[in-house]
């Protein structure tokens, strides 16, 4: 199988979608998971104010609200967690996103003290973290907090990973990539926008430039700058359309380079890396 055939088979992106149908597909998927696992009662999600967490949060709240209405069980809850490192540059967007999704519970945990303590402890041991490595430390601290909250509320940590992000491995291993359930996987970036438009989301939340915003020295660095390829090109590639050869090569290189992120810890029986 050629590399593009393999990528398209793995990422499961349809060339065209019906936004309403995809919304229902994700909501029913989330509901089915909790109904099957009756010891679980909540969804926990970190909210940044960007497109992906806004969409995921809205879908999670819809699923929880429907479960409560269908079962009469008020223990079903959604926890939307703000996890700033100090002060977030686009805090107003995060508040707009929270207002749009209207979560049952809003929590804020500032991760700055925890991250800075880890950086200082490592420095004391002779390990000086680069700004990039510190960015990954932030992502992992955020996930640690979400799992702590989930542990206290019979919760599932929901991920925001979609296929345009998965194909490039554009997330932190065991950080934002370390979740329990990903309701957006199969969608690319533009399809996520279509779902938010269908849901009546304020446009500025999905038309803004996507950024992981993890590095202190490069605040709000656009994803497309970091990747060297645009989301339109990634989306076209995943929909089976023609893209410039250099863009295709970059996408395929990211896919190969980050394949380890899409696997659990490697064992002697794995051969994908060889």
Curated annotation (Swiss-Prot):
**InterPro entries from the xrefs?**
NAD/GMP_synthase, NAD_synthase, NH(3)-dep_NAD(+)_synth, Rossmann-like_a/b/a_fold
The entry marks the following residues as binding Mg(2+), namely 52, 165
Q: In which pathway does it act?
A: Cofactor biosynthesis; NAD(+) biosynthesis; NAD(+) from deamido-NAD(+) (ammonia route): step 1/1
The record's disulfide annotation reads none
Q: What class of enzyme is it?
A: ligase
GO terms for CC? cytoplasm
For the ligand (deamido-NAD(+)), the binding residues are 140, 173, 180, 260-261
Instruction: Write out the residues that bind ATP.
Output: 46-53, 160, 189, 211
Q: What catalytic activity does the UniProt entry give for this protein?
A: deamido-NAD(+) + NH4(+) + ATP = AMP + diphosphate + NAD(+) + H(+)
- Gene Ontology biological process: NAD biosynthetic process
Q: What is its EC number?
A: 6.3.1.5
**A single GO molecular function, which one?**
glutaminase activity
| Record's keyword terms, sorted | ATP-binding, Ligase, Magnesium, Metal-binding, NAD, Nucleotide-binding
The record ties this protein, via HAMAP family, to: NadE_ammonia_dep (MF_00193)
Q: How does it assemble?
A: Homodimer.
The UniProt family comment states:
Belongs to the NAD synthetase family.
What is the recorded function of this protein according to its Swiss-Prot or TrEMBL entry? Answer: Catalyzes the ATP-dependent amidation of deamido-NAD to form NAD. Uses ammonia as a nitrogen source.
- Its recorded name reads NH(3)-dependent NAD(+) synthetase
Q: Which gene encodes it?
A: nadE
């Amino acid at each position: 199988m050629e590399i593009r055939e393999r990528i398209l088979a793995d990422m499961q992106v349809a060339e065209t979608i019906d936004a309403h149908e995809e919304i229902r597909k994700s909501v029913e998927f989330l509901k089915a998971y909790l109904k099957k696992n009756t010891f679980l009662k909540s969804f926990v999600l970190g909210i940044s104010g960007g497109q992906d967490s806004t969409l995921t949060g809205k879908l999670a709240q819809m699923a929880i609200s429907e479960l409560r209405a269908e079962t009469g069980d008020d223990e079903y809850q959604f926890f939307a967690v703000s996890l700033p490192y100090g002060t977030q540059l686009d805090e107003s967007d995060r508040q707009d996103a929270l207002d749009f999704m209207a979560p049952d519970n809003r929590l804020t945990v500032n991760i700055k003290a925890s991250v800075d303590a880890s950086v200082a402890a490592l420095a004391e041991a002779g390990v000086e973290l680069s700004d990039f490595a510190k960015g990954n430390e932030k992502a992992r601290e955020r996930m640690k907090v979400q799992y702590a909250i989930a542990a206290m509320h019979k919760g599932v940590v929901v991920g925001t990973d979609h296929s345009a992000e998965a194909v490039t491995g554009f997330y932190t291993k065991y950080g934002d990539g370390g979740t329990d359930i990903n309701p957006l996987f199969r969608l690319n970036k533009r399809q996520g926008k279509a779902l938010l438009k269908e849901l009546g989301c304020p446009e500025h939340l999905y038309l803004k430039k996507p950024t992981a915003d993890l590095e202190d020295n490069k605040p709000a660095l656009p994803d497309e700058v970091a990747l060297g390829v645009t989301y339109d090109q990634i989306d076209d590639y995943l929909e089976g359309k023609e893209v410039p050869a250099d863009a295709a090569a970059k996408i395929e290189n990211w896919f190969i380079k980050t394949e380890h992120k899409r696997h659990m810890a490697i064992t002697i029986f794995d051969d994908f890396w060889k």
